[in-house]
Amino acid sequence: PLETKLGRKRKVNQSTCNKDFSCVDGFCPSFVTVQGAKIKKRKVTPASDLPMNIFNKLPNPKEINIEKPFDIVVTGIGGTGVVTIGALIGMASHIENKGVSVLDQVGVAQKGGAVLSHIRIASSPKDIHSVKVGKTSADLILGCDMVVVASSPVRELMNINTTQSIINDHETPVAGFVLDPDHSFGGKRIRQIIEKSSKETNFIN
């Protein structure tokens, strides 16, 4: 769905297209086949041309002492990098000689299904007794998808007194739009649900 001055229209997100070309059989809302055309590529600067000294100006992050495990939950939908984020944070913690565990819950998600990554960081591996973040124990929610964050399995991990939430407020179309062109995403209601479940919430796009 694309909201315009002339009402709601439809557009195709080519970045999430499957490459099996089933769209040409009529399963894509575009219903258009362009022959002989090429996608215009963006002009990018080669890495070799970048001024590497800009990274030298960045201060080193301050190491902190963790008295108890710090619990992070990364949430999103399949195909958007939730598992990758968990792996990056896990490796960064390992490089700092911290104890870390990463548990990915992908279920049957491939594209569009809910995905969670439970990340626990401690001063030492012996301080981590469970790899799953417990109920009301999340210190930080990194929400790549609002709908997933507002779901019951995620909200029960949040604590109104301690949880900090950083949420991507992009409204990814849900299944309801397939059957009902006028389906309401309910973004305002979803925001309120998340805010009521967190101590502090920051929405970014």
Question: Residues of each region from the PLM?
Answer:
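C-terminal accessory/binding modules appended to enzymatic or scaffolding proteins
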Residues: P1-K5, F70-V73
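Terminal amphipathic helices with adjacent charged low-complexity linkers/tails
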Residues: L2-L50
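Active-site cofactor/cluster-binding pocket
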Residues: T33-V74, T80-N205
